[in-house]
From Swiss-Prot:
Residues 1-6 form a propeptide. This is Envelope glycoprotein. GO terms for biological process: symbiont entry into host cell; virion attachment to host cell. The lineage of its organism: Viruses, Riboviria, Pararnavirae, Artverviricota, Revtraviricetes. Specific enzymatic cleavages in vivo yield mature proteins. Envelope glycoproteins are synthesized as an inactive precursor that is N-glycosylated and processed likely by host cell furin or by a furin-like protease in the Golgi to yield the mature SU and TM proteins. The cleavage site between SU and TM requires the minimal sequence [KR]-X-[KR]-R. The record marks R444, D445, H684, L685 as: Cleavage. The chain crosses the membrane at residues 615-635. The surface protein (SU) attaches the virus to the host cell by binding to its receptor. This interaction triggers the refolding of the transmembrane protein (TM) and is thought to activate its fusogenic potential by unmasking its fusion peptide. Fusion occurs at the host cell plasma membrane. InterPro entries: GP41-like, Gp90_EIAV. The mature envelope protein (Env) consists of a trimer of SU-TM heterodimers attached by noncovalent interactions or by a labile interchain disulfide bond. Residues 446-466 are annotated as: Fusion peptide. It comes from Equine infectious anemia virus (strain Wyoming) (EIAV).
Length: 859
């Protein structure tokens, strides 16, 4: 039976003949391209099965993927151990003890880590001076010390009680002359009644001699101990003790208190009275600025007690006096038991501050035996949350508005132990400091910046080579730069110290100017009030300092102080300019030395500088270490995959280019041949068995002898075969045969591992796969996600991949929008359905189908 061959077109491939065979031959049904079929079971088909190739490739990919998974598991465990070690080192580093914050030690701050609620805490305002609300605490190795010019409030109070210091001013409301007479207080042993008798020679009662004082109006009479008053020229005129020393209206505050580390004039109202409270574990707390304070006389001997039944008990006595008009103010009597009282001047009378939950009282106590004291509450002045009690009726304070304070201060040990992390800028402690070794690198915590720090730390491995280059080439230059840098640092530190001193003076000048403005406003208000109503009221502003009175302050005045400030500012300006000029010169020389054209070395310096500055910012937070580990793990595990993908892309682009050039060369060579006629081409295809005539290629690359021709063709004469061989040799050159036949033979060799096939089978197979991999097929594979190596060129692959990614993103967005619209439509339909049913139900209820309502009938 004669075989009839005709051409069928394969999209994208060469024209392949399809032959009609005998009925006995059965074609295999598992092949995609099958130009010939055979009835010999021992022979395989010529064309390669695509399914077999896909299965083989899938097996290879699964094997590689399994091996890759095992490798990455090992690498992941190694990175886990590495990150754990790094995290442990950083955790240890963060746990090292750091320097303390002592830049601002002020009442109004909170000590971090203190067992007490508020180590240093005050709330309040100052009428004459305005505190600075914002401070920047800094970490340094400066030492805190005290000298003759600076003293902390804790030292000034000696953990017991503050002094009410002298102020050369004598203008105060209660510091006025009183008309007093001596009286005796007599009581019977069986009653609590006490009689007041006018006598010349007085006797002690309750440990004190007594005076009955009033003013010219005789509107108010006060019964006070003689120890609270001072006689004037042996007459019946008395004034309260200490009027020229305490309770003075401030006209000029001594410059002896430090605001932070800056000396200023600080005026407060009212003065602070700090007392000591014994706590557990031998800790002391100095506190109390808020409760009502009965202002009184402070003797040299001082003590502090807590008002409870174990220390002091009130003695209720009835004072009997002859008839009087107006107000008669009597004292409050206490009996107290004190232990471990040491007198400073061997006097029996001491001043005691007794503080309770809601008030503080000043007591004058007289020792009647070893531990028992008779005490009386002092009469003059009530200061604190209440008001100043004025003796005369025409001197009243209207609309009283006084400051309230709530303070507590820990002992000095906690100030040196804990970090001050919060300040409110109310009243500072005077602390002086000096630099010992210079600047200290700050440990920072930037929160989200720790993520950046982890990424920078991960790049340190790559930077090691760069820094090796820097170390080899830049040693001398770096040493020279360091020398200039040290000079710049020293000059900068000196300049900072000078600027700090200048700022101290500047603060004092600013606050003094502010105080002057306040005084001018006050005077203006007083004059306006006087012009309107013809009388004025006195103000009560107290000057409180943290240092005993120095007689040299009496020679100070505003003019001399301003002259001194201006002179110091000019001197400091000159020193600062000189110092900064030297620092600028050293810095310029350092920059010139460091300005190198070696960009690699400069990059290494910058990189390691950033790494050194950012790594400490991780902080001692376990969350940040976890984030750092995850980022490092992700970066290191993804880098090989990314590099492998880039290598595939690069090699794929090279392979695509090579195949493209080979195909162009083949077509160019083939175009030079003469045009074939249809008969010659049919003869060539029929005699493809010996087309090459090269026994070397048949033995090395062919898997089996070519037996694809029909039985009728096998019976044809040998001369026809020889002519066909000659024609094949004249068409296919040696170079073309070598380039085309070897890939096909390699594929056959991979299938069965044995040679013997005709090399034209491999050539035909390559042509089918190469021509079938056109742009259309490549794009289809890329869209399906099965494209491993680009077969249509690297630029086109990138462009098509971008188009696919954009298309998928747009598709996801549109699908999400469709889902949202569908949900909204369902929700609206549900709402409309509910409304429809409600309206239908109401309508049916109002308009039933059958009415059961009977209309009334009128007969």
């Amino acid at each position: 039976m004669v075989s009839i061959a005709f051409y069928g077109g394969i999209p994208g491939g060469i024209s392949t003949p399809i032959t009609q065979q005998s009925e006995k031959s059965k074609c295999e049904e598992n092949t995609m391209f099958q130009p010939y079929c055979y009835n010999n079971d021992s022979k395989n088909s010529m064309a390669e099965s695509k399914e077999a190739r896909d299965q083989e490739m899938n097996l290879k990919e699964e094997s590689k993927e399994e091996k890759r998974r095992n490798d990455w598991w090992k690498i992941g465990m190694f990175l886990l151990c590495l990150a754990g070690t790094t995290g442990g080192i950083l955790w240890w580093y963060e746990g090292l003890p750091q320097q303390h914050y002592i830049g601002l030690v002020a009442i109004g701050g909170r000590l971090n880590g203190s067992g007490q609620s508020n180590a240093i805490e005050c709330w309040g305002s100052f009428p004459g001076c305005r505190p600075f609300q914002n401070y920047f605490s800094y970490e340094t190795n400066r030492s805190m010390h005290m000298d003759n010019n600076t003293a902390t409030l804790l030292e000034a109070y000696h953990r017991e009680i503050t002094f009410i210091y002298k102020s050369s001013c004598t203008d105060s409301d209660h510091c006025q002359e009183y008309q007093c007479k001596k009286v005796n207080l007599n009581s019977s042993a069986s009653s609590n009644s006490v009689r007041v008798e006018d006598v010349t020679n007085t006797a002690e009662y309750w440990g004190f001699k007594w005076l009955e004082c009033n003013q010219t109006e005789n509107f108010k009479t006060i019964l006070v101990p003689e120890n609270e008053m001072v006689n004037i020229n042996d007459t019946d005129t008395w004034i309260p003790k200490g009027c020229n020393e305490t309770w003075a209206r401030v006209k000029r505050c001594p410059i002896d208190i430090l605001y932070g580390i800056h000396p200023i004039r600080l005026c407060v109202q009212p003065p602070f009275f700090l007392v000591q409270e014994k706590g557990i574990a031998d800790t002391s707390r100095i506190g109390n600025c808020g409760p009502t304070i009965f202002l009184g006389v402070l003797e040299d001997n001082k003590g502090v007690v807590r008002g409870d039944y174990t220390a002091c008990n009130v003695r209720r006595l009835n004072i009997n006096r002859k008839d009087y008009t107006g107000i008669y103010q009597v004292p409050i009597f206490y009996t107290c038991t004190f232990t471990n009282i040491t007198s400073c001047n061997s006097k029996p009378i001491i001043s005691v501050i007794m503080y309770e939950t809601n008030q503080v009282q000043y007591l004058l106590c007289n020792n009647n035996n070893s531990n028992n004291y008779n005490c009386v509450v002092q009469s003059f002045g009530v200061i604190g949350q209440a008001h100043l009690e004025l003796p005369r009726p025409n001197k009243r304070i209207r609309n009283q508005s006084f400051n309230q304070y709530n303070c507590s201060i820990n002992n000095k040990t906690e100030l040196e132990t804990w970090k001050l992390v919060k300040t409110s800028g109310v009243t500072p402690l005077p602390i002086s400091s000096e630099a010992n070794t210079g600047l200290i690198r700050h440990k920072r915590d930037f929160g989200i910046s720790a993520i950046v720090a982890a990424i920078v730390a991960a790049t340190a491995i790559a930077a090691s080579a760069t820094m090796s280059y820097v170390a080899l080439t830049e040693v001398n230059k770096i040493m020279e730069v360091q020398n200039h840098t040290f000079e710049v640092e020293n000059s900068t530190l000196n300049g900072m110290d000078l600027i700090e001193r200048q700022i101290k003076i500047l603060y004092a000048m600013i606050l003094q100017t502010h105080a002057d403005v306040q005084l001018l406003k006050e005077r203006q208000q007083v004059e306006e009030t006087f012009n309107l109503i013809g009388c004025i009221e006195r103000t009560h502003v107290f000057c409180h300092t943290g240092h005993p009175w120095n007689m040299s302050w009496g020679h100070l005045n505003e003019s001399t102080q301003w002259d001194d400030w201006v002179s110091k500012m000019e001197d400091l300006n000159q020193e600062i300019l000189t110092t900064l000029h030297g620092a600028r010169n050293n810095l310029a020389q350092s920059m010139i030395t460091f300005n190198t054209p070696d960009s690699i070395a400069q990059f290494g310096k910058d990189l390691w500088s950033h790494i050194g500055n950012w790594i400490p910012g991780l902080g001692a937070s376990i969350i940040k270490y976890i984030v750092m580990f995850l980022l490092i793990y992700l970066l290191l595990t993804s880098s090989p995959k990314i590099l492998r993908a880039l290598w595939k892309v690069t090699s794929g682009a090279g392979s695509s280019g090579s195949r493209y050039l080979k195909k162009k060369f083949h077509h160019k060579h083939a175009s030079r041949e003469d045009t074939w006629d249809q008969a010659q081409h049919n003869i060539h295809l029929a005699g493809v068995t010996g087309g090459s005539g090269d026994k070397y290629y048949k033995q090395k690359y062919s898997r089996n002898d070519w037996n694809g021709e029909s039985e009728e063709y096998n019976r044809r004469p040998k001369s026809w075969v020889k002519s066909i061989e000659a024609f094949g040799e004249s068409y296919i050159s040696e170079k073309t045969k070598g380039e085309i036949s070897q890939p096909g033979a390699a594929i056959n060799e991979h299938k069965n591992g044995s040679g013997g096939n005709n090399p034209h089978q491999g050539s035909l197979d390559l042509e089918i796969r190469s021509e079938g991999g056109n742009i259309y097929d490549c794009c289809i594979k890329a869209q399906e996600g099965t494209l491993a190596i680009p077969c249509c060129g690297f630029p086109l692959w990138l462009f098509w991949g971008l188009v696919i990614i954009v298309g998928r993103i747009a598709g996801y967005g549109l699908r999400g929008l469709a889902v949202i619209i569908r949900i909204c439509i369902r929700g609206l339909n549900l709402i409309f359905e509910i409304i429809r049913k409600m309206l239908d139900y109401i309508g049916r209820a109002l308009n039933p189908g059958t009415s059961h309502v009977s209309m009334p009938q009128y007969v």
